[in-house]
């Protein structure tokens, strides 16, 4: 594994040797030891948001999107209505989930470099009293933009509506306190800022809302009410759990706490982001977002203007030097993305910048 490239992506991402080694043990899915492992993971996850008094942690097999779909399908009644706030591809995915599930919804879309504002939400909720829930992406992974969650959450509370947060790319690195930010559900996953491996999502569901959600779900496997009720009764998952993923996440959480928890994880990622932005600027590559709305999770860069630049060739050359980047996901301009998260520090980020600079010279890309 020493020759494996560093994944500068928003997940899956580079994990530690300890996390990978945790997957070398096989677990019985009904065994008491594994049940205790699951309970410990959920307890530690709740502690990150100070949510044990107000929310249940409900784990679910699959990618983060599975958990997002489960949260909407379980917590939004079939006669509810979701206002989906969009400024990127993952907000659009939220709207598509509502459409496929048959949940009434409306959308409010801003430009990919424009956060939704609390004033926008205030106006939209005043104009449409039928809305029961608001769904938003905290950190929109398609650009790295950070939406103003605390301000928006207070507006939603004032209107008596309920908030569903996709915190896939922010949970564990950006502060979210359940005692200060009112939300019905917050969704995240194992393979992002916690530096576990992909394969498990989890939903922090407000206790009274989850208790009232029986019968809402469109799906047996994605019924969070049933999943929680079964776990509370037996300590077990309803269906075969991703045992190795859970074990890896448990180990990743131990390292998270050893590092210093959220403040330390946030600081490392912020240092990574600054090193990346400063280094790329020095070679002429422009970031898509202004610094004040850039989350230290993933950075979008404008592609060079030079005709000799082709992303596929650029990607393969950078990969050969030990770094895997991410293609752009914008509709209007050509970009590429570089993640700041995973088991990597500022020295690794500087090495990645050096590799990018060397590749651009090799490609004779001059018009940056």
Swiss-Prot record:
Coiled coil: none annotated. The keyword Isomerase does not apply. It catalyses: (2-aminoethyl)phosphonate + pyruvate = phosphonoacetaldehyde + L-alanine. Keywords: Aminotransferase, Pyridoxal phosphate, Pyruvate, Transferase. InterPro entries: Aminotrans_V_dom (IPR000192), NH2EtPonate_pyrv_transaminase (IPR012703), PyrdxlP-dep_Trfase (IPR015424), PyrdxlP-dep_Trfase_major (IPR015421), PyrdxlP-dep_Trfase_small (IPR015422), SP_NH2Trfase/AEP_transaminase (IPR024169). Its cofactor is pyridoxal 5'-phosphate. One of its GO terms (biological process) is organic phosphonate catabolic process. One of its GO terms (molecular function) is 2-aminoethylphosphonate-pyruvate transaminase activity. Its EC number is 2.6.1.37. It comes from the Bacteria. The keyword Signal does not apply. The modification N6-(pyridoxal phosphate)lysine is found at residue 192. Belongs to the class-V pyridoxal-phosphate-dependent aminotransferase family. PhnW subfamily. Homodimer. Involved in phosphonate degradation. This is 2-aminoethylphosphonate--pyruvate transaminase. It comes from Pseudomonas putida (strain GB-1). The lineage of its organism: Bacteria, Pseudomonadati, Pseudomonadota, Gammaproteobacteria, Pseudomonadales.
